[in-house]
Amino acid sequence: GYPHYNIKKLDDNKWSIELALAGFSKDDIEIEVKDNIMNINGELKTEDNEYVYKGISSRKFSKSFTLAEFTECESATMENGILSIILEKNIPEDKKPQKVKIK
């Protein structure tokens, strides 16, 4: 479905989601994270032009990603039609597995 995207692993606790959004600006896009769901919505502001031919899509979109527990959106940047979102998993110390020494 639209938009096309890649998910890259940057390290054990960090990922990047890149969405191809040619024609969109950062002002056309909204990112919201709630209850481990990241929703990305976009809508191009339409102009009242009279087209002889219209081959470039100006649709709106909505894309959702389920995030692992303790995953946070670290940053989002828009460059050359690519929206890059950096996600990082930050497990609190009291939730990490505890190693038990055997005596």
Descriptions of predicted regions:
Residues 1-103:
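Alpha-crystallin/small heat shock protein
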